[in-house]
Amino acid sequence: MGGGGAAAFAIFDRDHLRLLNVVNEVYQKYAYDLELFIHCSLDIVDEKAPKANEMFLGHLYTDQKYKSFGFITNTGVRMILVLEANNLDWKDFDIRAIFKRFHSLYCNAISNPFHTFGEEIRSKALLDAATDLISTHVEA
């Protein structure tokens, strides 16, 4: 495992269709575990969303390896950030800023006239930002 970094970042639409899923290459051998963890986190988003006062849902779930944070847009798009459970570097403020940035990138991506709703997002800016995010603070 890495040194307390981001393991994955995913975006799902309101019908739980995956729009973007980026897994740090250090965690590729754990891709199935991460997939299950992300889906557990999505269930928690569904529980928290109706009661939420803001789009940032905060910490969602933790197990022995990972912890997740969530964000839901006003159109029901869900964003999940998965960090290593031992990550103490990224504070709540940092994670809020990450989601705010990705919300903006998402809005730009879907504003592209060539984007088809319900299909995976093919935005270079969004993919590059997600790849940079999960590459931060990771030691192989």
Q: Where is each model-derived feature located?
A:
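Acidic, low-complexity cytosolic segments
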Residues: 1-8, 14-140
